[in-house]
UniProtKB/Swiss-Prot annotation:
The keyword Flavoprotein does not apply. It comes from Drosophila melanogaster (Fruit fly). One of its GO terms (molecular function) is copper ion binding. This is Copper homeostasis protein cutC homolog. Pfam families: CutC.
Amino acid sequence: MIREMSNHDIKLEVCVDSIRSAFAAEEGGASRIELCSALGEGGLTPSIGTLKTIKETLTMPIYCMLRPRRGTDFVYSDEEMCALLTDMDLLRENGADGFVFGSLNPDRSINVDQCRHVLLASGGLPVTFHRAFDLTDQKSMDENVDMLRELGFRRLLSSGFRPTAADGVDCLAQLIAKHQRDFIVMPGAGIKVSNLEEILTVSRCLEFHASALDTAGEDYVAPTTTRMECDVTMGKQDVDPYYGTNSIVVRKMVTIAKAMSSR
């Protein structure tokens, strides 16, 4: 039986990796920002300077990603955890409103000890467990959600064990129906204006996560300096289009979410 959606505003968390994208997220009406760096790598820990600059202007909550390097194993050494916890302390001292973290063992089970260290270091700020969850054993998903809640995580970001939330929406609906009373399961990955209504309808989520990207972003102004045509690049991203959060895309998503909230 599908649970009826209660009368509430469905919240949009926008994932950003730049100051300009953060401003676009707020302009579009997002409820919260997940701040990271290197979104093209799946999102890494942001810089203190970026957080401080955004906090000086924006009033919306900012959750900071805690991820010391690229890679989808999410198996961290003691040294990597030491660096991560140091970053966490500095981010908290400079205004972070929450954190996003995930850690696994080599067998892809959740690394409970490392999770406890992060939750203890959070100082009571909310912590989201990210899509590392989607690499765990799907057969144990309910037990793992219960464990995350008992550890102290406030929410889970998941694509339902599939590449995108649209692909995994049926699994997400199951998780949400079972755990939403005391834990937030937040769909994310590949959510677009074109598939948002279906994802909200099927999943019955209270929150969702998107980057609302557009090539160069809505208000991007190209540098006035002339870029010489040459073969020198600073990395793969230099040869790809520059993507940023588009406030118009955010606004469209918020409008859809509000319409769905009133149903």
